[in-house]
Structures are given as C-alpha cells and as structure tokens.
UniProtKB/Swiss-Prot annotation:
Catalytic-site annotation from UniProt: 113 (n6-amp-lysine intermediate)
Keyword Lipoprotein in record: no
Organism: Shewanella sediminis (strain HAW-EB3)
The protein's name in its UniProt record: DNA ligase
Gene: ligA
Pfam family name, one: DNA_ligase_ZBD
One annotated GO molecular function: DNA ligase (NAD+) activity
Gene3D superfamilies tied to this protein: 5' to 3' exonuclease, C-terminal subdomain (1.10.150.20), 6.20.10.30, BRCT domain (3.40.50.10190), DNA ligase/mRNA capping enzyme (3.30.470.30), Helix hairpin bin (1.10.287.610), Nucleic acid-binding proteins (2.40.50.140)
Function according to Swiss-Prot or TrEMBL: DNA ligase that catalyzes the formation of phosphodiester linkages between 5'-phosphoryl and 3'-hydroxyl groups in double-stranded DNA using NAD as a coenzyme and as the energy source for the reaction. It is essential for DNA replication and repair of damaged DNA.
Zinc listed as a keyword: yes
Length: 670
C-alpha cells in the first residue's frame, strides 16, 4: 500500500508540473501521448484506491454531482469595478489626477483587459478551497466545483512562500479556438450558438452541472491579489512584482503585462495591443492601467466603487445595435451568393458601418432575422462586419421575411445549393458578369500574377466596356484600347500594358492561386506546384493523387478534380498559356536537400537584403512551413529591422531567433 501511495503522490506531482509548464509557461514539457499515459495510470490507481486520491490530483477536474442552485458567498473584501477612459484626453486627465496626488512620477503596470468573467479564488495553506463570481461586488455565487475543472488553475500552490490565507482574483475566459470548437459542435447538433466568447465563458461557468463546465476548455488569468492573511506577509512592493509572485505560485499571468514609465509609453502600449488584438488567443476590450506602487495605491485610495489608482482604457466598441433596413445579394468569384444586410449607419469597431454580412440562408434562419429588425452588429479588427443577433423585443409588426433568391441577381442563372454545403451558388460561371469581375480581380491581385496598377475599378471598367471577358484577354489589351477607360491617358495606359506584359513571367504556384479554384489558397497552391512540378501532370491528376499533397483533404481534392474536369476551365488555362503566361521549371529536389522539412518558421520586421516574398519562397523550397504568428510550435523566427511583439514572444518562449544575415546563411546552406 505504501508503494501505491508513493506512486500516486509522484504521479500527481509530475502531472501538476506538466500542467504548469503547459498552461503557465506555454511550454509543454512532454508529448501529449506521454501525458495521457501518466494520467491514465493515475486514474487507474485512484479507482482501485479511492481513499488515496489527493485533493490536488489533476483527475479531480472532471466535474461532480450537479447542483440544484448556486449558493451565495460574501466576499472577504469587495470586488470593485474600474472607471473607464475612452480617449487620450481622458487618459491625460486621469494621469494628471494621479500625478497631483503622488510625490513622484508614477510608474504604471499595463495589461490587457480580458473580456470574460471576474472570479475570486481562495486558498488555505496552499490548497484550493472555494471560488466565487464577482456578483454585485459584495456578494457573488459559489462556483467552487466549476472552477475546480479549469485546468490552468492550481489546486495546490507551488513553492512554500505563499501566505496561509490567499485570495486570488482573475478572469475566466474562453480562448477563441475553444469558442469556435464549441459553436461548431452546437451547429452540428442544431443547437443555439453563443454570440461571443464572453457569453460562452459566463454560461459555462454558471452551469449547475460541473461536468458541462469541464467540457468547455475554459482558461484563467490572474490579475490581482485579494485578501492575504496575515496582513504582514511579505509581498511585492509593486503590482507587477505581485503578479510575478502569483505566477511563481502556479497561476497563469498574461505575457502582455508591461511596466510603463510615462504617458507616451502607456499610449504606445495601448496602440500596440489594439493593433495585435485579433492575434491574441483571447478576447479583450481594452487595456487596464494601474499605478504600480502599492504604497501609492494605498495613498490614492478609492472613490465610490472604483480605485483612484487604476482605469480601463477601452477600445472602440466592437458591437452596436442598429436597424436592418434591407438585404442585398452579392455574387462572388466562385458564384457564392451572399446576403448582405443594409444597415442604418452605426459607428462600431472604430469605423462607420452601413453593410454587414448575413453569411447564408442557414444563418438567416438561425438568427430568425427579418427586414425591419433591430440587430446587433459586430466588427472586430479587419473582419467583415456581421450581424450576430437580433433584439427580439424591438421587432415592429411591419418586419418582413428575407427571401433567398432562386435565380442569380446578376445574370439570372439558376442558384443551386449542393447537399451538405451552407453556400448557395450561381450556376452561370464566367457567363455571370459578377463572377467574371471577381475572377479577374483575383487573377491580377498581388498574391497571384501581381499586375501593378490593375485595381478593382480598372477591372470593372474593362468588363463593363467589354474589353475583357476572361483572364487571358488581359494579355491582348493595347494601350490605345486602355485609353477608353475613365481617367486613363496614353502614358498611364502604356505603363499598365507594360505591367501586364511583365506579369506573364510568374511562378507555377502564383498561377495556380490566380485560377481561383475553391479553397485553394497561397499555401495549398505552393504545395500543389511543388508536388506536381508541371501543369500537364496537375491537369491529369485524380482525387486520389490530389489527396497525397500536403494540406489537401478530401473536399479540396474534390474541388480540384471538378475544376480540371470542366472544359471551360481547361480552355481558360490553355488560353493563358497560349497568351504567354509562363514560369520557371520546378526541378526535382532530393529529400536530403529539404533541410528544413517539418520546421515552422516566422518572418517579422523589415528585411533589407531580401524581398520578404522571396525569403518565404526560398524557405518553403527547403521544406519549411512559413507561418504568420509565433507559437510554442515555432522552430525559428527571422527578425528583421524594427521587429516588434513577435520577437518578444519568441524570446519569451525560447524560440530560436536569427537576423537577416543568419537567414541568408541558412538559405546558402551554411
């Protein structure tokens, strides 16, 4: 029995250490298979010896008996809210108030304002005891069993320098990937979708059945200490130092926390986080700015229900209510018919929005939306604005159903919807003017043939004036014909014709991407080019051959097979080749020459000796995958001049970093 007890103790300790490395350090220390082997062994031992199960065992996060209701908990110390500022002028006023009341220039601790649910977690002698929601600030709901299921929250504190009684405050969030997965599962079951990750986190945390909470992949970030007893316990003299103490005790703390010594640094931090907002793993709605010195915090005190020493600098709102005035139907380059909501203009996400996507007929039905409804519009970063919900109680009696068209609104061809697909498509192909325009815009775009000066308006005029009907027609244009376009003189026309001529020299990958085959993006086009080497092999391939290509699944293989089986598509391809579009032959590369195969690289900053696209292509030619963001799976970051947050994150994760000269050495095989 003693040996079993020791093994359980050892497994619990080892697994908790692995959890810490994974959730707090973001640096997994063992493969998933090894972790699964260890935890399965622990589950087996605990099942056979339940009396030996330890309170901090990672197996105790699966959820327990469902509750009838939530009990109330009175907070040992009120959980206050923060005042907000919405502009630089308002922040300047906050800074002036702080400076006037402190004896020295304050240093601020800045961190992302997480958009989740605030919770209080209590530990006694280093062991998890209870958790509560913020509630009204004085009284919250007892969510002890639900919080226990969150893997990133320690059930037993690390180290030994923690106080006998410790209250930790932080935000429970649902990571974006977990939110997408949750809604995908709900959609597959025909269940109601969550509007945003915050609602999903709140709904998951308030489940009476903690097993449901355990299934929701919630996360947690600590942002403050609450009650500490004894009060004389030695703690950091600054907020940032206290956050680092929390991290040492096993709590996740945002890697974006930063000390800022003056107004400019704070504003730069705000601008940087706002710019990178969409790349973060979690939703945020601003930054929290706190006076770092605990002494100064005590000196400044509180006003009403908020501290004087902190504020939330909010981002422009991402969701607003407005009126749905009508619906138009747009046709894309692949024939997809998309309903677009015409809205009463509303300022959201930093811009005025008057149109938003409704995605497809299924989404219209799911929302239950009608023309005349008051709707909630969301705009996040560069994402196209979308209608995410209706305000049912504001629906007027005159609201009208939205009728999806049976024929194309542009060419009057039949609209068809393939079984199993959400998107309805016009069957007109290049006969459809809308598809023709979008197809040629795509073909001439920067990532395809990169025709310099061939903007959307030029393409639209070329088609409207019947100068171009297919991509190959671009290469037959003359300068005199181009002068028929608005604001196009002979000099500009000659320059554009020269740019079109230059675009004939391309790469096989760019050519394939430019064809606009459904779901064939840049990376897939490059993989297809590297696999087949030439056009004839590609055109004669079947689905079984396509599926052998990296990143090509059954659906993309089906799209490729269908595309090259259509005579009119083959005619488009052949006409382009006959018009003079060509590319260098791709030589067979020996396996041993793919020195970076299986590696993930990221480029950041400005490269001065090498074009970024060339660098990307050369890395891919050596077998590397070139990603857009740094993660624990990144093998190497190339940092050019003025490298920013990606470099910082790579250094935090211990990712190998090369400068441009280092990259050139790798490409040269040194």
């Amino acid at each position: 029995m003693h040996a079993i007890q020791e093994e359980i103790k050892q497994l619990t300790s080892v697994l908790n250490e692995h959890n810490y490395r994974y959730y707090v350090d973001d640096a997994p220390s063992v493969p998933d298979a090894e972790y699964d082997r260890l935890i399965n062994r622990l589950k087996q031992l605990e099942a056979e010896n339940p009396e030996l199960c330890l309170p901090d065992s990672p197996t105790q996060r699966v959820g327990g008996v469902a509750l009838a209701k939530f009990n109330q908990i009175t907070h040992l110390k009120p959980m206050l809210s923060l005042d907000n500022v919405f502009s630089e002028d308002e922040f300047d006023a906050f800074y002036k108030r702080i400076s006037d009341k402190t004896s020295e220039t304050p240093t601020f601790c800045c961190e992302p304002k997480l958009d989740g649910l605030a919770v209080s977690i209590l530990y006694r002698d280093g062991v998890y005891e209870r958790a509560a929601t913020r509630g009204d600030g004085s009284v919250g709901e007892d969510i002890t069993e639900n919080v226990r299921t969150i893997r990133s929250i320690p059930l037993k504190l690390r180290g030994s320098d923690f106080p006998p009684l410790l209250e930790v405050r932080g935000e429970v969030i649902m990571p974006k990937k977990a939110f997408d997965s949750l809604n995908d599962r709900a959609r597959a079951k025909g269940e109601k979708l969550f509007v945003n990750p915050r609602n999903a986190a709140a709904g998951s945390l308030r489940q009476l059945d903690s097993k449901i909470t355990a299934s929701r992949a919630l996360g947690f970030y600590a942002y403050a200490l609450g009650v500490v007893e004894p009060e004389s316990w030695p703690l950091g003299k600054g907020h940032h130092e206290q956050l680092m103490q929390l991290k040492s005790w096993g709590f996740p703390v945002s890697s974006e926390v930063k000390l800022c010594g003056d107004v400019k640094t704070v504003l730069d931090y705000y601008a940087d986080i706002l710019e990178r907002r969409e790349a973060l793993d979690y939703e945020i709605d601003g930054v929290v700015i706190k006076v770092d010195s605990i002494e100064h915090q005590l000196q400044l005190g509180f006003v009403a229900k908020a501290p004087r020493w902190a504020t939330a600098f909010k981002f422009p709102a991402q969701e607003e209510m407005t009126l749905l005035e009508g619906v138009d139907f747009q046709v894309g380059r692949t024939g997809a018919v998309t309903p677009v909501a015409r809205l009463k203009p509303v300022f959201v996400g930093g811009v005025t929005v008057s149109n938003a996507t409704l995605h497809n007929a299924d989404e219209i039905a799911r929302l239950g939306v009608k023309v005349g409804d008051t709707v909630i519009v969301r705009r996040a970063g560069d994402v196209i604005p979308q209608v995410v919900a209706i305000v049912a109680e504001k629906r007027p009696v005159s609201a009208n159903d939205i009728l999806f068209p049976q024929t194309c609104p542009v060419c009057d061809s039949m609209v068809e919807r393939t079984e199993g697909e959400a998107v309805a498509r016009c069957t007109g192909g290049l006969f459809c003017e809308a598809q023709r325009k979008e197809a040629i815009k795509h073909f001439a775009s920067r990532k395809a043939l990169n025709v310099d000066g061939m903007g959307d308006k030029v393409v639209e005029q070329l088609i409207d004036k019947e100068l171009v009907a297919s991509p190959a027609d671009l290469f037959r244009l003359t300068a005199s014909a181009m002068t028929m376009l608005d604001r196009m003189g002979m000099k500009s026309a000659t320059k554009l014709v020269a740019a079109i001529e230059d675009a004939k020299q391309t790469t096989f990958a760019r050519f394939l991407y430019g064809l606009g085959i459904r779901e064939v993006g840049e990376a897939t086009a490059a993989n297809l080019a590297n696999y087949f080497k030439n056009l004839d092999k590609l055109k004669s391939a079947d689905a079984d051959e396509f599926i052998k290509v990296d990143d090509v699944g059954a659906i993309v293989a089906q799209h490729l097979t269908y595309f090259f089986a259509q005579p009119h598509n083959l005619e488009v391809v052949d006409n382009l080749v006959q018009a003079g579009v060509h590319w260098p032959e791709i030589e067979e590369v020996a396996e041993e020459a793919l020195s970076l195969k299986g590696q993930t690289w990221v480029l950041t900053g400005t490269l001065t000796k090498l074009n970024r696209n060339d660098a990307k292509a050369q890395l891919q030619a050596l077998g590397a995958k070139v990603a857009g963001s740094v993660s624990k799976n990144t093998d190497c970051l190339v940092a050019g001049e003025a490298a920013g947050s990606k470099l910082t994150k790579a250094q935090d994760l211990g990712v190998k970093v090369l400068d441009e000269d280092g990259l050139l050495a790798v490409l040269a095989g040194e």
